[in-house]
A protein has these predicted regions:
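N-terminal interaction/assembly modules
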Residues: 1-159
Length: 159
């Protein structure tokens, strides 16, 4: 995660982290959002510092409250619809259970943002979530996020 992040990018990262945590079912979205906004969680990320796997904690720019809260509120309000859109976009040989939790949180945040902020250009949303995905994965997941969010965005625009 060595790329310089903006407050809006940090908001998206925080939303992904919050939805990942929400996926464990131990806290409400409101509880998790408060913890992020208070800086109790999500203020740092682990970054590899060399080719040997050495890691250190690196501070993250604070999230922009409007974007972060908007993504989480959109997910809370539309969770069933968002998860159905993600499920419908999966390849025929994939099931929802096969989608790893981090990847699912990235997709959930991306779709929630597309719903909550239709004025944000789709290309910006796609680039941001593809960039986020590349912080966690190096393989096909990057193409999966790009393709699925692109297809969902097209479906939302035509609805």
């Amino acid at each position: 995660m060595s790329k310089q992040r903006t407050n809006r990018s940090s908001s998206r990262l925080a939303a992904v982290q919050a939805l990942y945590e929400y996926g464990f079912g131990e806290k409400t979205i409101d509880q998790i959002a408060r913890e992020f906004m208070n800086g109790d969680i999500g203020a740092e990320v682990i970054e590899e510092t060399d080719d040997f796997g050495t890691e250190e904690f690196v501070p993250v720019m604070p999230a922009e409250p409007t974007l972060f809260s908007g993504i989480l509120a959109s997910y809370a309000e539309n969770a069933g619809h968002i998860n159905e859109m993600i499920k419908a976009s999966l390849a025929a040989d994939w099931t929802e259970d096969r989608v790893e939790k981090t990847l699912k949180a990235i997709l959930q945040a991306g779709v929630a943002e597309l719903l909550a902020f239709p004025e944000t250009p789709v290309a910006v949303v796609l680039k941001e979530y593809v960039d986020l995905t590349s912080c966690f994965y190096e393989g096909a997941e990057i193409r999966v996020v790009n393709g699925m969010l692109s297809n969902i965005a097209k479906a939302l625009q035509s609805a």
